[in-house]
Amino acid sequence: AYAFGLLMKHWAPNFLKQNPAILGSAEVSSIAVLLVVVLVVLLVSVAVGLMFALTSMRLKGTYFAMLTLALSTALYIIIKSTDLHEWTGADEGLHGIPLPLWLNPTQNRLTVYFITLGFLCVSYLLLRRFVNSPTGRIIVANRENEDRMRMIGYNPVTYRAIAFVVASVFAGFAGMFFSIWNMSATPTMISAVTTVNALIMTIMGGMGTLIGPIFGAAISQTIQQFFYTWFGARWPLIFGVLFILIVMFLPYGIVGTWRLQKGNIREGWKRLLKLFATKTEADAGQKPPSV
């Protein structure tokens, strides 16, 4: 989000001002500049993912989570620093990010929505393809049992780094679209609150699944809106109680629990239908009473 905001606010306007029609027309030039910015966002996301992977490659479990949270908090503090106020806006952030007319949410909100929706669908298909690839299957197996993967000749650290970079790239693009929608980039985007919200959505939907976090995000945001309307300022307390209940009774999330129980549910329906069919045949086979 900040890489996109910094480039669009500080570099892109100056470049287009000095080269208004470098590719023949101002509109084509603005699209080309936007593509360059997207490419830089991709490179920055890869670099951040590698940084996190290299600094936490030897850690597991709680220590791994603590270090990644500490690194994100360090970035949050750096961005809020008053020494970088001229570039990052410090506490205020970057507001009024200049965007092309067709990508401006204040004037073409529906267009931006469908572009974002298209990106979500493409991302899901790409990640589905990646998970089903040989590398993706090794990453999944590495998540389940690192020691076993090491015994059969794979380096868990390498595949964990690949997973980190892939996740960082898609998170970077998600941040870019979030900054486009709000036309701003603020420190809260990389704060611990944002991290916790993402974890809540993932846990509610189902960890270890691709469709789960999507359902979790939709359900979480919808519930939060209703709870805010019904309970006002007390909605976080009610939402917290609901989240605890979900963790207790749906420990694998909504999608994860459904997948685990799908066979039992299907078998239950078969038994129920068989019971109804048997009863219907028995009723049909009974002779009418004699008069």
PLM feature segments, named:
Residues 1-291:
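Transmembrane alpha-helices and adjacent helix-loop boundaries
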